[in-house]
Amino acid sequence: MWDQKWVIGNWKMNGRLQNNNSLMHRFRILPTAERVLIGLAAPTVYLLQLHNAMQIVLNNRILTCAQDVSRFPDNGAYTGEVSAEMLADTGTDIVLIGHSERSLYFGEKNEIQRRKMENVLNVGLIPLLCVGESLEEREAGKEHEVIAHQLSILQGLDTKNIAVAYEPVWAIGTGKVATVEQIADMHAFIYKEILSLCGSDVKIRVLYGGSVKADNAADIFAVPYVDGALVGGASLSYDSFTAIISAAQNA
């Protein structure tokens, strides 16, 4: 896992039962990709459907991922919340933490994200922390400062396995992609920060996210310190998603 390329698809608020089943059945002919860890992050209501399909149809070749988790560690009067323990019950393996859309629409910042990280680790799941700067922050030359602040929640966590997705906010769903030089700079910086915060013996995966598609995936995977991709809209298409997986396998 920690020496593979990761390709994680984030469906966001998309999917229907019948459409999900159709996509899962297409994945039965998924090309061989031993060098790639593949995951799909579905809306919470479809996680059990996804997990069952992974077991029955795909022999666990694709991991089940959740898009979010509650900040509250225990069961209780938190209407609408889903705990890390509940996600574990659905067969979830990886949980996205801190996606920019959570910050944008729900005001989630470092303190909440740290609590979510701890909750996920406490039940044995893998958190995938999302970080990224806005266009205004990049134009002001503050991208390193912003990312360092977001990564600071990793300090002191009880884990030696760290997964981060770098998603420049200005490239999410916009069709814009950071240049190879920008991606290389930020991924090298993120590696350096993680080693500083968590120690030299930590295992690291740093994914790139931000309009990753079949036609640019190979170039992105060739960038130093890019360990995979967090894929948005392209993960809803079998052809696009498998093309990205193949690019990772061949990187």
From Swiss-Prot:
Which domain of life does the UniProt lineage start with? Bacteria
Enzyme class per UniProt: isomerase
- EC number from the UniProt entry: 5.3.1.1
**Swiss-Prot/TrEMBL keywords:** Cytoplasm, Gluconeogenesis, Glycolysis, Isomerase
- Annotated residues for binding of substrate: 10-12, 173, 211, 232-233
Q: Which InterPro entries match?
A: Aldolase_TIM, TIM_sf, TrioseP_Isoase_bac/euk, Triosephosphate_isomerase, Triosephosphate_isomerase_AS
Chloroplast among keywords: no
Role according to the record: Involved in the gluconeogenesis. Catalyzes stereospecifically the conversion of dihydroxyacetone phosphate (DHAP) to D-glyceraldehyde-3-phosphate (G3P).
Protein's recorded name: Triosephosphate isomerase
Q: Which organism is it from?
A: Neisseria meningitidis serogroup A / serotype 4A (strain DSM 15465 / Z2491)
